[in-house]
From Swiss-Prot:
The gene is OC90. Keywords: Calcium, Metal-binding, Secreted. The lineage of its organism: Eukaryota, Metazoa, Chordata, Craniata, Vertebrata. This is Otoconin-90. Major protein of the otoconia, a calcium carbonate structure in the saccule and utricle of the ear. Together with OTOL1, acts as a scaffold for otoconia biomineralization: sequesters calcium and forms interconnecting fibrils between otoconia that are incorporated into the calcium crystal structure. Together with OTOL1, modulates calcite crystal morphology and growth kinetics. It is unlikely that this protein has phospholipase A2 activity. One of its GO terms (cellular component) is extracellular region. GO terms for molecular function: calcium ion binding. It comes from Cavia porcellus (Guinea pig). GO terms for biological process: otolith mineralization.
Length: 51
């Protein structure tokens, strides 16, 4: 009976890994965007410090 079911967990794990990858990359891109916004808001003060 154990040999009858392997295809189902495989589909489950592949779907889970896809979801994990999607959430991971979307989270990474969100972090990159927020970091870019932080640097944009800090940009003028950095330029003032350099001047």
């Amino acid at each position: 009976h154990a040999l009858d079911t392997p295809h189902f967990p495989q589909e489950l794990t592949s779907a889970l890994s896809k979801n994990i990858c999607i959430t991971f990359f979307s989270g990474m891109f969100k972090n990159v965007e927020s970091v870019a916004e932080i640097f944009d808001s800090l940009g003028p003060s950095f330029k003032q410090d350099q001047a």
